[in-house]
């Protein structure tokens, strides 16, 4: 625990020293450093290139990134509970929010101190923290090999795709969301996943590879080892930017996804700065920037006009975003370990 606190103290001291060198008056006024969690990949790049400079310009304070996945954030916050947390702002997907609230790791978001909060879509205004974007899954496919966009999850079963279908393990939101959606379409419930596993068993002859994680999954696409597979919008856009031949098709059964949100951590060292940092992510001009390549983040501010890849692949308007089907993570989270074990036992092996 002392190591975590010492490291954080060093980050803050370094920030204060840099400001002191810049000028005594500035150092006295703003010798503060915020520590904010962010996801690896596109989001860490977006925060580094867009958010951090804007935050410094607006507040005069320095923000540093802690690049870490949501589940690991929960673990670190839990380990530090009762002491100074390792970061002030948490960056979660929907499943981690439930765990963080249950364990008292985040506090209710102070809406009155966040002027941009009221501009969010109603579905993005959560009392535990604003939803800053969405992740939407569909069918990824190689347009050089598949000229007609697939419109049904059942298309994955087509014998012509033998050995060319990809899957990812259930340790990712993508894997779980795919399982839940297929289960729903096949008549299952959140208490009965037999239909989903029956579908996966039927799919096995077509499966060419099952990636252990999302990084390995991206490699399958980059090396063109798969032609068709469940994927999400943001990852497809990231690969397309690298000239990987991949497109996303939303099945006729509709889009399904989850939210990504920001949260004020319990006992945050810099709560006021944390709220300003979070509120900056809600600003319409910031979300407009993040909607464009190379970030392609789906905006949640109602004043941002949708355009580009989002309108081509996903939805045409903000009203359509509200129609994206979500997952009942309250029911799924307690089963997640059992579902992963069953997948590893029946499918992955």
Predicted regions and their residues:
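N-terminal secretory signal peptides and thylakoid transit peptides that target proteins
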Residues: 1-18
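Early extracytoplasmic/lumenal segment of secretory-pathway proteins
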Residues: 30-98
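Extracytoplasmic ligand-binding site segments that recognize negatively charged/polar headgroups
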Residues: 41-48, 86-225
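A ligand-binding cleft/hinge motif common to bilobed small-molecule-binding domains
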Residues: 97-99, 222, 227-245
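Periplasmic-binding protein-like
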Residues: 135, 198-203, 240-266, 302
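A bilobed periplasmic-binding-protein/Venus flytrap-type ligand-binding module shared by bacterial periplasmic
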Residues: 138-145, 181-184, 259-271, 278, ...
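Mature extracytoplasmic/periplasmic domains
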Residues: 265-324
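Conserved C-terminal helix/tail region of periplasmic/extracytoplasmic solute-binding proteins
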Residues: 320-349
